[in-house]
Curated annotation (Swiss-Prot):
GO molecular function, one term: translation release factor activity, codon specific
UniProt modified residues of type N5-methylglutamine: 234
Primary location: cytoplasm
Listed name of the protein: Peptide chain release factor 1
Sorted UniProt keywords: Cytoplasm, Methylation, Protein biosynthesis
């Protein structure tokens, strides 16, 4: 491990020099590539330097303890320092092992989130709106931007489907664990008998795909335009601004009508299409990995029931990691970081186990 860390530190120092060279700065594509490499290495190199500094401190303290001429009080202080530094080194070693794990190449990307109402009729649609609000508030809390891509509302405050984009550094790394089936148990406001209804919605978190990730051949795309309409078929506008794009080889269809401009609707539809096609490739890769892994966290299986939101008990339970939180209101208001951290930690622990086995 230490050899690998020393190599990465050397590479980091080499990149630090390169990105300051005028000829590299003048070549902007190359400069941006090297700056990203440098930035990606920064956290692990800083942690490694902290480790080396701590190890040096430990060696110095041990040297004092070996010195028989040293003052007794000084030696006692050295003993205490050794215990503290040994504990710190153990923690740093664990952190460095995690930082050395292979990184998901999509972790830094923006995401497209798709929420669809499943079983449960109107209640499922209302819950889809609840989760849209939850992710929106979480994004705002961490300083990310949210952009609506497409929405099909139920007319009573819910969504049959809502697609939106979250832009922010590391959005995919934190939100990718949200993909799957979310179940809600609550008493509908229209339920006079007080019976608890169970509804489900599905969430898909897709990393945004650019041309480098997935080259879209426009010869494979059919674009249809139509007049956008609102609830009850009422005409929203009198121009054919709504767009439907079809990827002919796979039959994947995306429609967008939220914008007044046909061009903007087409751009959004193609962005969603590209992300869905990249996601198919990611799902295939993960299916292969899942055959070798017993992981419950990182598989991204869309048909898997991942979480239950129980309103009468005020609890949220994540079934993959058996974590239950009793603060449903704040959770639905975007306070979901604790659950995200628990999922990330579990996923990292499983990957470490695989590396060490």
């Amino acid at each position: 491990m230490l050899d690998k860390l020393a190599f990465l530190e050397e590479k980091y120092e080499d990149l630090s020099e390169k990105i300051s060279e005028p000829e590299i700065i003048n070549d902007q594509p190359q400069w941006k590539k090297l700056v990203k490499e440098h930035s990606d290495l920064e956290e692990i190199v800083m942690k490694y330097r902290e480790y080396k500094k701590t190890e040096q401190g430990l060696n110095d303290a041990k040297e004092i303890l070996r010195d028989k001429t040293a003052d007794e009080e000084f030696r006692e202080m050295a003993k205490m320092e050794i215990a503290e530094l040994e504990e710190k080194i153990e923690v740093l070693e664990g952190e460095l092992k995690i930082l050395l794990l292979p990184k998901d190449p999509n972790d830094d990307k923006d995401v497209i989130v798709e929420i669809r109402a499943g079983a449960g009729g109107d209640e499922a649609g209302l819950f889809a709106a609840d989760l849209f609000r939850m992710y929106t508030r979480y994004a705002e809390n961490v300083g990310w931007k949210v952009e609506m891509m497409s929405a099909n509302d139920t007319g009573i405050g819910g969504y049959k489907e809502v697609i939106f984009m979250i832009k922010g550094h590391g959005a995919y790394s934190r939100l990718k664990y949200e993909s799957g089936v979310h179940r809600v148990q609550r008493i509908p406001s229209t339920e006079s008998g007080g019976r608890i209804h169970t509804s489900t919605i599905t969430v898909a978190v897709l990393p945004e795909a650019d041309d480098v990730d997935f080259e879209l051949d426009m010869n494979d795309i059919r674009v249809d335009v139509f007049r956008s309409s609102g609830n009850g078929g009422q005409s929203v506008n009198t121009t054919d601004s709504a767009v439907r794009v079809t990827h002919i080889p796979t039959g994947t269809v995306v429609s967008c009508q939220d914008e007044k401009s046909q061009l903007k609707n087409k751009e959004k539809a193609l962005k969603i299409l590209r992300a869905r096609l990249l996601d198919v490739l990611i799902q295939e890769q993960q299916a292969e990995i899942a055959q070798d892994r017993k992981s419950q966290v990182g598989t991204g299986d869309r048909s898997e029931r991942i979480r239950t939101y129980n309103f009468p008990q005020g609890r949220i339970t994540d079934h993959r990691i058996n974590v239950t939180l009793y603060r449903l209101d704040s959770f639905l208001n975007g306070d979901i970081q604790e659950m995200i951290d628990a999922l990330i930690t579990t996923d990292q622990a499983e990957k470490l186990k695989e590396v060490n086995s």
